[in-house]
């Protein structure tokens, strides 16, 4: 009886270990894919942006990574559609950032109801 119980426990442990290994492998693969995509995007942006614009974007990425990501995507899209031509300078990047800020800003109003 105890041998069966031990065998069942060992089988459960083995399955859990396999599941954990599978998850870790999947997470590692996902991280590698993200790193590969990041490297591709960085290479594209190096060709599209001036050094000052890249510096501004790097500083922004430290403080507001989601805004930096949106700006990177916007620059790539604008160049692909021909709306701006490379190299994208710092002034153009600032204009793109201002436009992103305007489009994502939420105005809200606080109302206080008194009884």
UniProtKB/Swiss-Prot annotation:
Q: Which family does it belong to?
A: Belongs to the PDCD5 family.
Per the record's keyword annotation, is DNA-binding included, yes or no?
yes
Q: What is this protein called?
A: DNA-binding protein APE_1087b
Q: Which Pfam families match?
A: dsDNA_bind (PF01984)
Q: Quick check: keyword DNA-binding in the entry?
A: yes
A GO-annotated cellular component: cytosol
Q: What GO MF terms are annotated?
A: DNA binding
The alphabetized UniProt keywords are: DNA-binding
Q: Which SUPFAM superfamilies match?
A: Double-stranded DNA-binding domain (SSF46950)
Question: What is the species of this protein?
Answer: Aeropyrum pernix (strain ATCC 700893 / DSM 11879 / JCM 9820 / NBRC 100138 / K1)
């Amino acid at each position: 009886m105890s041998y069966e119980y031990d065998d069942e426990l060992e089988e459960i442990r083995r399955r859990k270990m396999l599941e954990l290994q599978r998850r870790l492998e999947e997470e590692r693969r996902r991280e590698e894919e993200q790193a590969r995509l990041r490297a591709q995007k960085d290479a594209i942006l190096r060709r599209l942006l001036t050094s000052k614009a890249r510096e501004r974007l790097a500083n922004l990425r430290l403080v507001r990574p989601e805004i930096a990501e949106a700006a990177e995507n916007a620059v790539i899209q604008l160049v692909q559609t021909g709306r701006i031509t490379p190299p994208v300078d710092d002034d153009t990047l600032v204009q793109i950032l201002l436009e992103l800020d305007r489009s994502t800003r939420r105005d809200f109003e606080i109302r206080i109801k008194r009884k």
